[in-house]
Amino acid sequence: MATVKPPGRGCGALPRWLLGAALLLGLRLCMELRHAGSGPPGRGDSPGPPRTHLLSAPGSPRGARRRQVTYVRSGRRVLPRGGGSTTSPEPSCCAQGGLLRRKGSRWHIELQPWAGPSRSLDEEASRFLSYISTTQIACDHMGTDSLATDSSPAPKPWLVCLDDRFGLAHQIRSKRCRLYSLGLGSDDTHFEVSMANGGCEVHRFDPSVKSAHVLERQGLWHHRLSIDWRDPHPAVAAQKPHGNTRKLGSILNEFGHHKIDVLKADLESAEWKVLENLILEDVLEQIGQLVFEIHLHWPGFEVSGSESGVVRFWYSLLKELERKHFRLFHTYKDLTKPQLFLKKDLFNASSCYTLSWVNTKWR
């Protein structure tokens, strides 16, 4: 006896099977499309941010700062890749440091009280000239030519203190001394050459140097850079990425130098604003000794105000040095220069003095 199938069962199984297969196929296609979307973008995709290609020295880390010295060559230190021999295991003279210094929190120095109730030029000049003519600490061993013996006298008394208690002599003997010399077209390099011969790493900054960085002899570098109290405006710096004007703190960052044993400066009346910048940005903490030539025949670049106010500003800067533990150990009055004080023949003053300070907290 024949059996009768319920209506609709045989025909309904096929559509459900096809529906399941189609669903599985769809899920697989979605997964493949999603995986393909994570790959490189197509030509029509919007590009990412542009990449900046920076010039860096051989061996410098990726992502190094834009403004950095692009050489590591020195006569007595490690030479760059690609040839040359090394005569010392010490690091290269201007290694890529990329230091990030904390800037000072002040915008202005603290002005000292007026010298007298009348706020006159006579009162201010008398106090200032007495201050720069009186040493504050004794130095038993002063030298113009490092520890080397040299019979030729230095044209100017650029004196450093070589007492063992201040550490410079030890740094020279151990060949770890570093000197920065700031100038404007001076041909007098006796002091720099002598310190280099004595074992110091010397960097002379002068915008009149023909090449960007020149190694004259072992340990003596010349850089076509001018030290200013401000960095160039960012718009100007972008147009001239290799501009030759920079603050001293910026130079230290670019060269990767943490400390300067001696800072010598002959800046032809720019010294007052440069010194102010060193104070406000706490760069003085990185300096062991200062040897500055100061000029008194006019206020100096971007120093304004009444005559008595200008002298008060000068005096306040030097008192800031004292607060930073710098003590005057030598003073020299240049009698070969015009005897002028703010364009006047007054107070028996010279227009030019050379002053030497030592940082008593230097380690």
From Swiss-Prot:
Catalytic activity, EC: 2.1.1.-
Subcellular localization, as worded in the UniProt entry: Secreted
Endpoints of the signal sequence: 1-38
Disordered: annotated segments: 38-97
One MF term in the entry's GO annotations: methyltransferase activity
Domain of life the protein comes from: Eukaryota
The protein's role, per its UniProt record: Probable methyltransferase.
The protein's name in its UniProt record: Probable methyltransferase-like protein 24
Native source species: Mus musculus (Mouse)
